[in-house]
């Protein structure tokens, strides 16, 4: 059986605030760690029937980039819902929310 691994390395300042987020994966085309400004990881706990989340971002990430990041995460969820369940209505509602949020972000820039 094939196995894949994803690794995260988080460099923290003296107050435990992320200064650098690095990641690597066995299936990534580039070799070595790649820097990112934010990660949002969700894991389904099937025993507790809830989601465990890890959200990290560097202190250097601008607020508008953070907003765009979360809008993009929601858009990815819309596609995942469609792929996993075939629920076009739910996927469409999430995409509609993304469009409204994107308009608000553009207005604030």
Language-model segments: which ranges?
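Short loop/turn motifs at secondary-structure junctions and domain boundaries
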Residues: 1-4
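C-terminal charged interaction modules
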Residues: 78-109
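Active-site- and interface-proximal helix/loop "cap" or "latch" segments in soluble metabolic
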Residues: 19-85
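Active-site and channel-lining beta-strand-loop segments
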Residues: 6-25
């Amino acid at each position: 059986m094939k196995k894949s691994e994803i690794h995260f390395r988080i460099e923290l300042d003296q107050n435990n605030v992320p200064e650098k987020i690095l990641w690597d994966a066995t299936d990534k085309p580039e070799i070595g760690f790649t820097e990112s400004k934010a990660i949002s990881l969700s894991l389904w706990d099937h025993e507790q029937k809830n989601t465990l989340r890890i959200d990290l971002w560097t202190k250097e990430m601008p607020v508008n980039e953070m907003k765009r990041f979360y809008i993009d995460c929601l858009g990815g969820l819309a596609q995942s819902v469609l792929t996993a369940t075939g629920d076009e209505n739910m996927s469409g509602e999430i995409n509609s929310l993304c469009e409204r949020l994107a308009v608000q972000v553009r207005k604030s820039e």
